[in-house]
A protein has these predicted regions:
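Compositionally biased, intrinsically disordered low-complexity regions enriched in proline and serine
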Residues: 11, 18, 35, 143, ...
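Short, flexible loop/turn segments with low-complexity composition
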Residues: 90, 201-209
Length: 221
């Protein structure tokens, strides 16, 4: 196995996908070098662009190997740097369920959550129909989750990759489209996520950047 100290993460603490990966690191207290992507460190921005010209982040470098996409980064950590908290079950069927839920949170919560954010920074102030569609999509996702949550965590009794995705997506989704009283299990699940040390650490690390949230960050969480 490669040494944990070989890990360098290019990320920003207010990014939902970066938080998703950082939660995985914090769950297993895995040491890594954090390169903040921002005007504070122009060199980090240049390095990330050279490592991954498509421009997305987070980007992980492990002993010279570049790893991209948040879910793949977490699976890479599980494969090469396993810790006491198993974020992906060894049982193939259980692992498939976790991977599905990871995709659910990224595609059906994170993506529509970002639509109003991006629309709000358009020069014309955003398209009302896009905002409305995002609200419907999030309510639909909340309802599906309300109907399928059967344990304390997304896939059941254990905290997994799916919860890393859920924490980052539901944290911001509730700012964009509040999780109403019609979804008590989802509200309680979000509260459990925010109370988990790895997640609360990410929330605190991102707090100084809340003024960047285009829709205005609520005075809570």
């Amino acid at each position: 196995l490669r040494r944990l100290v070989s890990l360098t993460l290019y990320a920003h603490p207010f990014s939902s996908y970066c938080q998703k990966v950082q939660i995985a690191f914090y769950e297993n207290a895995a040491p890594f070098t954090y390169r903040l992507l921002g005007p504070e460190d122009p060199a980090a921005m240049e390095e990330r662009q050279a490592l991954w010209p498509l421009g997305r982040f987070p980007v992980l470098v492990d002993d010279g190997v570049t790893v991209v996409e948040s879910s793949i980064i977490i699976e890479h950590l599980e494969l090469y740097h396993p810790g006491p908290v198993k974020l992906l079950p060894e049982d193939p069927k259980a692992a498939l369920k976790v991977r599905f839920l990871d995709r659910f949170f990224d595609n059906y919560v994170m993506t529509p959550m970002q639509t109003p954010v991006f629309e709000s920074i358009r020069p014309d102030g955003g398209r009302k129909e896009a905002m409305a569609e995002a609200a419907v999509a999030l309510d639909t996702a909340y309802q599906w989750l309300e109907d399928h949550l059967t344990g304390p965590w997304a896939a059941g009794e254990d905290f997994t990759l799916a919860d890393c995705a859920a924490a980052a997506s539901l944290f911001y989704a509730d700012w964009v489209r509040p999780i109403g009283e019609a979804f008590p299990k989802v509200r309680a699940y979000r509260a459990r996520l925010l109370a988990r040390p790895s997640v609360s650490r990410c929330v605190e690390e991102g707090r100084p950047y809340r003024h960047f949230f285009p829709l205005g960050a609520p005075d809570r969480d």
